[in-house]
């Protein structure tokens, strides 16, 4: 397991797993290729793994940096039902 400040998830091979802790939640993400993911960790939106699209991470102004998850930024993803989710700030990122 590798801890990182930033992860460029688009360069990870399909099947790669990320563990992302935010101030409020612990997310487990399986990379399916490109922006496609399977994610769990939110008790309402994704209590069990669901497919979605990872959009990147945003700064405090809401500007999204596509393709990257960054510590101190907010994780942005869209679930298959097209529900957009923005998390609290990322506190740690682990590539498993």
Task: Explain the meaning of each model-derived region.
Residues 1-17, 21-22, 26-96:
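Cysteine-centric segments in proteins
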